[in-house]
Amino acid sequence: MRAEGADHSMINLSVQQVLSLWAHGTVLRNLTEMWYWIFLWALFSSLFVHGAAGVLMFVMLQRHRQGRVLSIIAVSIGFLASVTGAMITSAAVAGIYRVAGKNMAPLEALVWGVGQTVLTLIISFSRILATL
């Protein structure tokens, strides 16, 4: 999928290109393109983490009468909350880059997107340990 930018340049919005990092040598100049690349990395890294946690919960609670349903609900709510936060923080990072007049390399988008998921994990575990 391609979108037309305000300066009549083409913005690449291909999920396959973002996830495979095909865009070596190119830079992300547009706010939409920066946001999209950062958000997709945050989305798929969060999906991986929540998928692994969901499988673990499902296996550990398979004999529990309501455990399977509770694990699906918990993973769904956690995933939706992290994706909502990723939308906002990805837009903030892209906006800061755009206002500063900087371009973003595709690898920087990877670092920002996966970094959001790692930071979410660290904050989540620190909150759980504080309640024990």
Curated annotation (Swiss-Prot):
Query: Which residues are on the Cytoplasmic side of the membrane?
Result: 59-68, 126-132
Query: Glycosylated residues?
Result: N12
Using the UniProt record, give the first listed, main subcellular location: membrane
Coiled-coil spans in chain: none
Top-level taxon of origin = Eukaryota
Query: What are the GO BP annotations of this UniProt entry?
Result: negative regulation of canonical Wnt signaling pathway
Alphabetized, the UniProt keywords read:
Cell membrane, Glycoprotein, Membrane, Transmembrane, Transmembrane helix
PANTHER family for this protein: SD17342P, TRANSMEMBRANE PROTEIN 170B
Q: What is this protein called?
A: Transmembrane protein 170B
Q: Gene encoding this polypeptide?
A: Tmem170b
